[in-house]
């Protein structure tokens, strides 16, 4: 039995994702395709453009059999922890194979992952403060394994491979060549496949949405066209500004990943910044990537502390967002053997501890912005 897993954000789901699901189906055959998908907050430190249930529904309609929500404590983390948490959860669900999109599927990711995992993580190698940690890490990888990997999906694919190796290689890796636009490419008007970031930019800049039907499934294109609010940092910035200005230095110091005096820098620069882009520019240094600072801003906005993340990570459960007929059968037959708790319905008891407590709390802001309940009263989607 080949139970194929996919780690995803689907932010939003587009034809490139549909291609990846089709490739996964070639491996799975009649066996299930299991997706672990980030919820209403994504790895780069932003709100998702659509709700987790909207994105899960499109994924199920496009060929996925089970969609679970990646806990916040894994979803909003750098690539290494994002990969480790997601692969560990897939293995606990009985997944045997991992399919992921990259720019060059000819690379032997399993081999490269094992070689990188053997490199001592000696922080003395990363003391050049004129460059970010990630830049120095990529340079070290190129030096040690003989391959320069600097494209975003290949970097993430390597993180999957390293995590898989460190967990004892529970999953067989299947890299698939991406089709269409690159990760951050602008929309190519005559093309068919567009990147998620390009589609988000189109929506956020109020451009014509008539071409969406060529890039995303028809039902999703209709929903996106009708959607009145597209979450973004400029929308959230007043809330972040209030949070920072009303918090003491000691309060800010408790925020997850707040370090090296960034609490003082954020306090100082928030008064001088007209919008989130300017704020990021003002607190940016060569030591930190913009992604790291966006995640830190999100933790600050949502008041996520070190203790919150530890409690969530130590008691991670998985929220079931939806299933197909095949997915239901797989759940019924194998749920007792899963090594993680599956939550199908949020109630007051389950929402008080572990990863679900953090999920429910952080989702409240998304609910306020979008006006749609995300946990209480929701049931898994069935297609």
Swiss-Prot record:
Gene3D superfamilies documented for this protein = HUPs (3.40.50.620)
- What's its EC? 6.3.4.-
| BP-aspect Gene Ontology terms | tRNA modification
Gene Ontology annotations for the cellular component aspect, listed alphabetically: cytoplasm
Q: Name one Pfam family in it.
A: HIGH_NTase1
| Residues binding ATP | 7-20, 101, 153, 178-179
Official protein name in the record: tRNA(Met) cytidine acetate ligase
The organism of origin for this protein? Lactobacillus helveticus (strain DPC 4571)
